[in-house]
């Protein structure tokens, strides 16, 4: 009897032990297979604006490349898949988080003003906008030296390996992507493209190329092969640069090989702004990080949450405060002048990062949206948008890169170097931003506390100067929770509005990353009028109109955001469907 009882107890204990082991095993497995959802990755991810380029970036990571390696490879690819947005003839900004050192640095390789330029260039803004075609708007390209500096500091794989996938793409029968074809057939762009040297590349007779049409580009393939094997100096001081300078001189360009040789990227610390549990790292002036930081810092103080969006009046209230904050931000863009070229601007953006100004702005935001432009320090300025490309990368070790690259407006200056296969930027067009409509050029570069003196005046370009930019490749880090958000966007002047709204929706309003990027945005122009992306909530639009917000129609919206987030063991990556993007990870 006792023996039978003992056997029963032993069996019960054995069963309990097995059950406990199963539970422990399940817990352990759940940690490795966390409930991340089917769209999550376990290790790393790349978000470029096309599937093929995201895939190339992922492959580089899987070959033990660093996040910088993957970013460069994805950008080189994008210059071929979406050449209307970026390329070797443009410029790039990297924001890089090194998990080993815990530091975030910025490499600014945006284009600069060449030594020879028209002193009265900015008097041509009214005639040039919105496209800015012509060789007079070309800045010194910085793209390749930006890649080289980033690779020198943070690369792991051999330099040439980063170019091989795109060279293979070009040599293997490259075809036109649907997004590129859409730009080629755009009714505004098409006449200028047809009249430019780009016609030889993108037209079949009188017709623009269509999706899946062959796009032979042997000159660019050869250029990439040369840069891969010989390094970037073959462009900046060697035969590639000489060929480019000679080609575009036929279009009226005054760019010289000396301009190329003098170009150097700038390496600086990222701006750092606390946003509750997160810290935002973004690029300093002349990039737009200070404006993005200002917007989010002001909005943080309103303590918006998921509950704020639960009822119609709450949603209207959130977007009213956003609109008013964007108006005040627009009035501060004068602070984005290049501090290297204009020393009095050295500390001009510092106030934008602090709580004192943020609190002052919050106190000036009330329930109405019909204040005079002077309330926000707004002056009617030139604006344009739709260009640029962004890549976000998160590596296995937690290091991250946000990189935004551009030739400025679609197809840049529409000037093509046939021997190198390079499309040139029109970056000097961004200098028009500092010249309010109706202003003339003034020889005085700095007057008092504000650049250019009173509103209505502007000052000529300075050789070596970088244009003010809306580019905001950014990284947000929550060290306590081990969370990150690597984010940036494209779309010219729409970039800051789009990125700010994606961050606001993700951090505070309860949106997941995909929904935060997909949500229709609003934008405030320099007249203080609200522009709504198609499908933006009509209910919110009516509510804002009731509060006195003026609205206007924007002829063309193309705001594009790419982001990667890390939440515990889960990695999420989203490329914006507005540009038919698709992220990749593993």
Curated annotation (Swiss-Prot):
The active site is at residue 388. Keywords: Acyltransferase, Glutathione biosynthesis, Glycoprotein, Hydrolase, Leukotriene biosynthesis, Membrane, Protease, Signal-anchor, Transferase, Transmembrane, Transmembrane helix, Zymogen. Gene3D superfamilies: 1.10.246.130, 3.60.20.40. It comes from the Eukaryota. Residues 30-586 are extracellular. It catalyses: glutathione + H2O = L-cysteinylglycine + L-glutamate; an S-substituted glutathione + H2O = an S-substituted L-cysteinylglycine + L-glutamate; leukotriene C4 + H2O = leukotriene D4 + L-glutamate; S-[(2E,6E,10E)-geranylgeranyl]-L-glutathione + H2O = S-[(2E,6E,10E)-geranylgeranyl]-L-cysteinylglycine + L-glutamate. Signal peptide: none annotated. GO terms for biological process: amino acid metabolic process; fatty acid metabolic process; glutathione biosynthetic process; glutathione catabolic process; inflammatory response; leukotriene D4 biosynthetic process; proteolysis. The keyword Transferase applies. Heterodimer composed of the light and heavy chains. The active site is located in the light chain. This is Glutathione hydrolase 5 proenzyme.
